[in-house]
């Protein structure tokens, strides 16, 4: 199972590990709130402590705005990772190798030229 996780060969192993780890973390977080206090006021486990060295979450007025910003930045990061995964699947190389290949000749090695040259329609014989 560990080899499948390291080399990302088993999607089911990765999914099961993700569900177990996130379930444990969220269970711990939900279990550390007083009964009837879940979702009220500021959650003492999120965000803060060592993850908030500037004390940005101390103000209850800006806390909801910071939560929305965190969600949006997380979605943006996931979209970027999806691009990395798609690029790795198509080219068989990682993002650094693809970037270095692009830097060799940016006008010839880019997404548009790859799209035009690799997916050009081929002539079809009409019956």
UniProtKB/Swiss-Prot annotation:
It is a multi-pass membrane protein. SUPFAM superfamilies: Chlorophyll a-b binding protein (SSF103511). Binds at least 14 chlorophylls (8 Chl-a and 6 Chl-b) and carotenoids such as lutein and neoxanthin. InterPro entries: Chloro_AB-bd_pln, Chloroa_b-bind. Chlorophyll b 3 binds at residues 10, 26. GO terms for biological process: photosynthesis, light harvesting. Chlorophyll a 5 binds at residues 69, 87. Signal peptide: none annotated. Chlorophyll a 6 binds at residue 102. Its main location: plastid. Chlorophyll b 2 binds at residue 6. The chain crosses the membrane at residues 11-28, 76-92. Chlorophyll a 4 binds at residue 73. Chlorophyll b 4 binds at residues 18, 29. Chlorophyll a 3 binds at residues 5, 70. The light-harvesting complex (LHC) functions as a light receptor, it captures and delivers excitation energy to photosystems with which it is closely associated. The LHC complex consists of chlorophyll a-b binding proteins. This is Chlorophyll a-b binding protein of LHCII type 1. The lineage of its organism: Eukaryota, Discoba, Euglenozoa, Euglenida, Spirocuta.
């Amino acid at each position: 199972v560990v080899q499948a996780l390291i080399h990302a060969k088993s999607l089911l192993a990765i999914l099961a590990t993700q569900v177990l780890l996130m379930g444990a973390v969220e269970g711990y977080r939900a279990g550390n709130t007083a009964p009837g206090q879940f979702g009220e006021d500021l959650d003492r486990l999120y965000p803060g402590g060592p993850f908030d060295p500037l004390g940005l979450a101390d103000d209850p007025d800006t806390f909801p705005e910071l939560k929305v910003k965190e969600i949006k930045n997380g979605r943006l990061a996931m979209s970027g990772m999806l691009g990395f995964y798609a690029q790795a699947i198509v080219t068989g190389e990682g993002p650094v190798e693809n970037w270095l290949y692009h830097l060799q000749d940016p006008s010839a090695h880019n997404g548009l030229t790859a799209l035009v040259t690799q997916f050009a329609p081929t002539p079809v014989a009409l019956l």
